From Swiss-Prot:
Sorted UniProt keywords: Amino-acid biosynthesis, Aromatic amino acid biosynthesis, Isomerase, Tryptophan biosynthesis
Domain of life from the UniProt record: Bacteria
Annotated GO MF terms: phosphoribosylanthranilate isomerase activity
Record keyword Isomerase present: yes
Reactions accelerated catalytically: N-(5-phospho-beta-D-ribosyl)anthranilate = 1-(2-carboxyphenylamino)-1-deoxy-D-ribulose 5-phosphate
Protein name per the record: N-(5'-phosphoribosyl)anthranilate isomerase
Cystine pairs: none
Pathway connected to this protein: Amino-acid biosynthesis; L-tryptophan biosynthesis; L-tryptophan from chorismate: step 3/5
HAMAP family listed in its UniProt record: PRAI
Organism per entry: Syntrophus aciditrophicus (strain SB)
Family per similarity comment: Belongs to the TrpF family.
SUPFAM superfamilies to which the protein is assigned, alphabetical: Ribulose-phoshate binding barrel
Coiled-coil annotated spans: none
Amino acid sequence: MTEIKFCGMTRLSDALVAAENGANALGFIFYPRSPRYLPPEKARELIRRLPPEVIRVGVFVNEAVEKVKEIYHICGLDLVQLHGDENPDYCRRFPAPMLIRAVSPRNGADLAVLDRYSCRAFLLDRREGALYGGTGGISNWELGRRIRERFPLILAGGLNPENVMTAIENVLPHAVDINSGVESAPGIKDPEKIRAVLAAVRRYQGIRETEEERKEPERFRIFERTDEKI
């Protein structure tokens, strides 16, 4: 089963639409230069009103370790996503089971480099200029297939209701992460596009999932709470 995360949530109404229609996780961006930045105090109030089964992911870009930990506790986050230039030594400051590391061809996402990181999963996104994701550009699916062969993979980068089924079919990621592809403006999600993405993923699963696959033990889940804390 392909898991689904919607990122860049800024409004409770959008978050509830995603959660109530089956999203596995929601992402909150704590990078002040992002148009989808959400102050920790506002994020905390929003998160408190979410259904308990939804996983809360905090997205950080080149932030001080202690600041990440502070926001993690203030907001009641479940997982931490590092979306900047954080090196393996920085990442080791966090328990691997609760860490998602975003990578892109520009920041050296080859298999040899990935071996140096300890994390729950890699998130493949497209980076343009000084922007750390959320650009709407399609990521490198060939690289995604290579990463998927060895690591749990979240596929991001330009996904929307029209192409998410094709992306899953080509890359076979453990999860997909959608941001600008379901927006009417940065940080403002379109409820119908959210529902359309979720419906498209369900259609794919219904078409591709065989009886034999249903009998297999459930595979590793990325969006799941862990016993690890920071």
